[in-house]
Amino acid sequence: MAALVRPARFVVRPLLQVVQAWDLDARRWVRALRRSPVKVVFPSGEVVEQKRAPGKQPRKAPSEASAQEQREKQPLEESASRAPSTWEESGLRYDKAYPGDRRLSSVMTIVKSRPFREKQGKILLEGRRLISDALKAGAVPKMFFFSRLEYLKELPVDKLKGVSLIKVKFEDIKDWSDLVTPQGIMGIFAKPDHVKMTYPKTQLQHSLPLLLICDNLRDPGNLGTILRSAAGAGCSKVLLTKGCVDAWEPKVLRAGMGAHFRMPIINNLEWETVPNYLPPDTRVYVADNCGLYAQAEMSNKASDHGWVCDQRVMKFHKYEEEEDVETGASQDWLPHVEVQSYDSDWTEAPAAVVIGGETYGVSLESLQLAESTGGKRLLIPVVPGVDSLNSAMAASILLFEGKRQLRGRAEDLSRDRSYH
């Protein structure tokens, strides 16, 4: 049997060689058929040149001028091609969320709760514009959640080193987003310290000796709008007393439109410590919510003591006046704050404006501070029968009026110097 197998093996080997040779020749013929001849030479010696089709002309190497024009027409493609190289050279890496990954949900639970936010010292920023403003101001990022890599590449690469980068589905970001149209990127930052922040030079150049003190502001939308107005007017600082909504709440950040990263914001202050944050010789002015006609209807005693005219305070004064008649006791402990129209001059010295909430008004401590610094109540007159102005609107009116007065004083001073 072995003798039969051995000859068969030697017979099969030549057959394989023949098949391989035939297959190689067949492939060569097929490849030759695919080619189009350039010149045909017949046995008679006649030569026929084949003409190329108009659409199959050989490509010409682009000239240097045309290449430059092409680059100018496609700047986005060129910049996009450079971005990955910068990203790769930086050595940044990101993780991709796996099914059932709870990192996003656990972090969102912390940053959306004020007690956890203050305990952990972290805030949530959403959107490329707000995140870019925070990075430029020197805020410290801790973690980014994004749905597309292009969103992350728009941020400064040097600011992303050492930061946890996690790619998640857009649906997951949409579930936790407070925006109507989520932008596909969320950033977790350490709570900014105003001492370590670097604010824009243009903001510092237009800064005025004008401060804002927020007293019992509970509405996030109002506070965010007020901060935006303060940044636009050129306030040098904003102080928030205890009882105000957290300045770093997501709704306040969204309404502020980046104002948090243009000026110092000092949060959660006791009234005893507020004077420590005021420049020397600062006068404190309190915004009054009542109009001239409502002011005239108040009792002389309430008007003299400078209370904001809401029903709660007027009832309190009525009770106090009746008690004075019975006991004959004096109420010298109440602050005496004069009333002044908001458009009269009140910026001859550094000024701080106190804005109270719409529900509770300004506090007794704010009036005491205004009395001790020689400040006044700034009255914004309204038409009889119209309710008090919105806190954000009143703050905008007073702050931009203060800016107008300060600019006018600066122009008068420069004019006097030019004369001399």
From Swiss-Prot:
GO MF entry, a single one: RNA binding
Domain of life of the organism encoding this protein: Eukaryota
Keywords tagged on the record: Methyltransferase, Mitochondrion, rRNA processing, S-adenosyl-L-methionine, Transferase, Transit peptide
Catalytic activity: guanosine(1370) in 16S rRNA + S-adenosyl-L-methionine = 2'-O-methylguanosine(1370) in 16S rRNA + S-adenosyl-L-homocysteine + H(+)
Binding site for S-adenosyl-L-methionine: 356, 380, 389
The EC number(s) this enzyme carries: 2.1.1.-
Transmembrane segments: none
Enzyme class: transferase
Keyword Mitochondrion included in the entry's annotation: yes
PANTHER family, A to Z: RRNA METHYLTRANSFERASE 3 (PTHR43191), RRNA METHYLTRANSFERASE 3, MITOCHONDRIAL (PTHR43191:SF2)
Name this polypeptide is given: rRNA methyltransferase 3, mitochondrial
Annotated region described as Disordered, given as residue ranges: 49-88
